[in-house]
Amino acid sequence: MLPARPTSWKGHEVLIKAVAALNRPDVTLLLLGAGDGAPRFVAGLEQLARKTGLDGRLRIAAGSDDMPSALMLADVIAMPSTVPEPFGRVAVEAGAMGRPIVAFNHGGAVESVLNGQTGWLAEPGDISDLSRALGTALDLSQEKRAELAKKSRAHIIKSFSKEKMCQKTLEIYDELLQNRARTSDNIIR
């Protein structure tokens, strides 16, 4: 599943191609949120699905008011943004829910996804590498999936909880104030 607004740089087309390359008739791709896009955008995704052989295995839906439930229904959460996202909330939300994440190795995903532990990071723009990572995630045994979920939740709590984010923000303010004080001291001398 790709939970993302209907914007071309979110990687909908890249993901369709990567899922098609898996050549697995048991896999259905859900583009959650893409259904809110302009009819031309949606039609383009449907046309690409037909062209790549995903016809009948692509679902395009509007956004959900209950993202935790939507995330729990997915076997894998994909973040194939073609442009690095500064934070990428989807990876943190999916990690908190213990879902395997597959993303490109750039932007916020570099911090939120621990490659091989809480998900997989593919080479940016490399559809074959993204497809390989998706296959790895889909092939996880129940035992490995449970282990990944535990690691993923622990990583998110440790690194992205409200308390941790406040602590990091205050540390930045403190550093800026110390730098300002040092600069002021140098000017006075």
Residue positions per predicted region:
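A conserved mid-protein helix/loop that constitutes part of the nucleotide-sugar donor-binding site
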Residues: 7-21, 43, 128
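A short, well-ordered alpha-helix in the C-terminal region of glycosyltransferases
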Residues: 136, 143-159, 168-171
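Acidic donor-binding loop of glycosyltransferase active sites
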Residues: 72-86, 99
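Short acidic alpha-helix that forms the nucleotide-activated donor recognition element
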Residues: 20, 59-74, 96, 114
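Short hydrophobic beta-strand element within catalytic cores of glycosyltransferases
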Residues: 100-103, 113
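Conserved acidic donor-binding segment of nucleotide-sugar-dependent glycosyltransferases
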Residues: 115-116, 120-127, 136-142
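Nucleotide-activated donor-binding/catalytic signature segment of Leloir-type glycosyltransferases, i.e.
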Residues: 42-64
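Glycosyltransferase donor-sugar binding loop
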Residues: 3, 28-43
